[in-house]
């Protein structure tokens, strides 16, 4: 006869057994609103949750530093601007609102892939600029050569010397438009594609260009006065 190990007799342990009570995990969570800068018409982006472990716990410390991406079409209500996404970082908590500050921008992958053309020259440039509050941003710009009506060849390649001149134009435009500006103005220029239009206008004097746009903006170093640089609606 096999010997049962201690505790295996369920009938004998029924009297002292404890019931496993199901705990609703969502009852310990609190919801907060995610808000973008007030320069956008629809600055309430969504909600985020945080787990509350005790009544004395400061939940703001758990929320500060969280990042979220929002499509520009959702921020402005214009569906034609769906190819651009802005990144924000929670820098302050006011009541139930998480105030986000600019943390970067990038184009969607399908838009970036659609810029490239076969038998054309792709010109890329990246440059670091310093904003008004000391934030260091790395800006990436792309441009593609354009076929003119008088061109008979299917290959539209520019010379290396022309490519260097166009890249120099990109550097100058990035520095002229963004250097020393506050983050609100930088976001407005990125949303309106001011840099891409200026690069296409000035660079086309060297060689015809198309699809000139800022594909990415990366935050290399955050400034000290980021919270004061952003004017956010409290309500």
UniProtKB/Swiss-Prot annotation:
Compartments where found: Cytoplasm
Q: Which InterPro entries match?
A: Ribosomal_eS1, Ribosomal_eS1_euk
Q: Does the keyword Cytoplasm apply?
A: yes
Instruction: Outline the subunit composition.
Output: Component of the small ribosomal subunit. Mature ribosomes consist of a small (40S) and a large (60S) subunit. The 40S subunit contains about 33 different proteins and 1 molecule of RNA (18S). The 60S subunit contains about 49 different proteins and 3 molecules of RNA (25S, 5.8S and 5S).
Q: Where is the major localization of this protein?
A: cytoplasm
Species name: Vairimorpha ceranae (strain BRL01)
Write out the GO biological process terms: translation
Q: What is this protein called?
A: Small ribosomal subunit protein eS1
- List residues, modification N-acetylalanine: 2
UniProt similarity note? Belongs to the eukaryotic ribosomal protein eS1 family.
Q: Which HAMAP family match?
A: Ribosomal_eS1_euk
Give me the gene this protein comes from.
RPS1
Keyword set for this entry?
Acetylation, Cytoplasm, Ribonucleoprotein, Ribosomal protein
Cellular component (GO) terms are: cytosolic small ribosomal subunit
């Amino acid at each position: 006869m096999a010997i049962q190990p201690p505790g295996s007799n369920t009938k004998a342990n029924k009297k002292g057994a404890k019931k496993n009570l199901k705990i609703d995990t969502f009852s310990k969570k609190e919801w907060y609103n995610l808000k973008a800068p007030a320069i956008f018409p629809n600055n309430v982006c969504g909600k985020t949750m945080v787990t509350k472990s005790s009544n004395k716990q400061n939940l703001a410390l758990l929320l500060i530093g969280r990042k979220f991406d929002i499509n520009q079409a959702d921020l402005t209500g214009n569906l034609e601007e769906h190819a651009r996404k802005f990144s924000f970082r929670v820098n302050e908590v006011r009541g139930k609102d998480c105030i986000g500050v600019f943390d970067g921008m990038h184009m969607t992958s399908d838009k970036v892939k659609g810029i490239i053309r076969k038998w054309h020259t792709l010109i890329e440039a990246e440059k670091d600029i310093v904003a008004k509050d000391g934030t260091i941003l790395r800006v990436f710009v792309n441009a593609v050569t354009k076929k003119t009506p008088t061109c008979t060849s299917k290959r539209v390649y520019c010379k290396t010397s022309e490519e260097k001149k166009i890249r120099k134009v990109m550097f100058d435009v990035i520095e002229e438009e963004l250097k020393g500006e506050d983050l609100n103005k930088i976001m407005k220029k990125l949303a309106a594609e001011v840099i891409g239009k200026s690069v296409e206008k000035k660079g086309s004097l060297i060689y015809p260009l198309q699809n000139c746009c800022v594909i990415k903006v990366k935050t290399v170093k955050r400034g000290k006065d980021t919270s004061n640089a952003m004017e956010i609606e409290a309500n």
